[in-house]
Curated annotation (Swiss-Prot):
Organism: Otolemur crassicaudatus (Brown greater galago)
Residue numbers binding heme b: 64, 93
Name of the protein this chain belongs to: Hemoglobin subunit gamma
PANTHER family listed in its UniProt record: HEMOGLOBIN FAMILY MEMBER (PTHR11442), HEMOGLOBIN SUBUNIT EPSILON (PTHR11442:SF7)
Sample GO molecular function, one term: heme binding
Family: Belongs to the globin family.
Disulphide bridges: none
Example GO BP: hydrogen peroxide catabolic process
Keywords: Heme, Iron, Metal-binding, Oxygen transport, Transport
Length: 147
């Protein structure tokens, strides 16, 4: 279980209030699919994923990215129980979708990069560290059913 300090919780909550869930979610998922093309196999119903521009402009990628970041928003409201928050999604991704749990870590890292790009100098090392801790905790919670 990940333990967040009061300062880390405040940093994450403050940053999250400024995140554009739709835009950043779509960009993060799109970048994941471009940079790690083997992850595309989990999205075969999304239509054209043949190029970076097709992926980044794909409405299904954008919609699912928004859904992913909305789930992360729920986790931020429940930072003390990430495992419980993601129990159902962990089961779904493990038992039904058979997603490699390493992909959760990859997406988290891509999300941190997207946030750093969007926030620029405002994205301090302290903010990055708190975000990395958060996405690592979420990745671990999502991988829980695999163990």
């Amino acid at each position: 279980m990940v333990h967040f300090t009061a300062e880390e919780k405040a940093i994450i909550t403050s940053l999250w209030g400024k995140v554009n869930v739709e835009e950043d979610g779509g960009e993060a998922l799109g970048r994941l699919l471009v940079v790690y093309p083997w992850t595309q196999r989990f999205f075969d119903t999304f239509g054209n994923l043949s190029s970076a521009s097709a992926i980044m402009g794909n409405p299904k990628v954008k919609a699912h990215g928004k859904k992913v970041l909305s789930s992360l928003g729920e986790a931020i409201k429940n930072m003390d129980d990430l495992k419980g928050t993601f129990s159902h999604l962990s089961e779904l991704h493990c038992d039904r979708l058979h997603v490699d749990p390493e992909n959760f870590r990859l997406l988290g890292n891509v999300l941190v990069i997207v946030l750093a790009k969007h926030f620029g100098k405002e994205f301090t090392p302290q903010i990055q560290a708190a975000c990395q801790k958060m996405v690592a905790g979420v990745a671990t919670a999502l991988a829980h059913k695999y163990h």
